[in-house]
Every structure is written in C-alpha cells, then in structure tokens.
Amino acid sequence: MSQIDKASRRQKIKDRSRKQVHGNEKKPRLCVYRSLSQIYAQLIDDDNGKTIMSVSSMSKENRALEGTKCDVCRIVGLQLGEKAKAQGITKVIFDRNGFRYHGRVKALADGAREAGLVF
C-alpha cells in the first residue's frame, strides 16, 4: 500500500468517525495523533471549539523519557489522565483519529484508563 493510499484511507476513516464523535465541556473528546516517532493527545471541547489540555511526548518533561515508543505512550496517557482528573474530568470520548487501535494508540488509551479516565 502506497503512502498516498494510507493517508487517504486514514482521512476517510477520520471523517467518518468525526460525524459520530463529539465532545463537550463535561465529556471532552480525547483526540490522539501519532507521528512516526512521537504521540500527541488532546482533550477537546467541540461545543466551544477549544482545546482543554494537551500532552505529548515532545513536552519538556517527556523528552528525556527512555524506553520503547509504547512505554512512552503509556506514560503520556497516564499524564493526561492525571491532568484531567485534576481539572475534574473523569469521562471522555476516545477519538483514535483514523489510526488503528493497536500498539502506541492502545498504549496511550491504557495509560489514560489506568489514571482513572473512563471511556
């Protein structure tokens, strides 16, 4: 499968799922983006069009993390869950953003669940 086919496939899946996935202030959307070497996660309030918080493997505290990419993703998920609980958010809607629920995306989701987020 060529790179163009992968990108268009992911975009189609993303567009299809975005019709059903919608977050609000009390139950925001947990959006995940996975690049080749990094991972980014955001809690988004779609009603107001605002990002409530974001955590990534590129943030200052996470740059020095060692281990496999999946280990780093799990830690990012834990950090996101802890920040969300500090703001009083316990329930979220998971948006895998067209990526397969496997590997690093699953590790981030598992880390967020370990921290106490429900989805």
Swiss-Prot record:
GO cellular component, one term: cytosolic large ribosomal subunit
Pfam families assigned: Ribosomal_L18p (PF00861)
Family according to the record: Belongs to the universal ribosomal protein uL18 family.
Descriptive protein name: Large ribosomal subunit protein uL18
Family matches, as InterPro entries: Ribosomal_uL18_bac-type, Ribosomal_uL18_bac/euk
Function as written in the Swiss-Prot or TrEMBL entry: This is one of the proteins that bind and probably mediate the attachment of the 5S RNA into the large ribosomal subunit, where it forms part of the central protuberance.
UniProt GO MF annotations: 5S rRNA binding; structural constituent of ribosome
Subunit structure: Part of the 50S ribosomal subunit; part of the 5S rRNA/L5/L18/L25 subcomplex. Contacts the 5S and 23S rRNAs.
Organism from which the protein derives: Chlorobium limicola (strain DSM 245 / NBRC 103803 / 6330)
Annotated stretches, region: Disordered: 1-26
Gene: rplR
Skewed-composition ranges (Basic residues): 9-21
Biological-process GO terms, alphabetical: translation
Keyword terms, alphabetized: Ribonucleoprotein, Ribosomal protein, RNA-binding, rRNA-binding
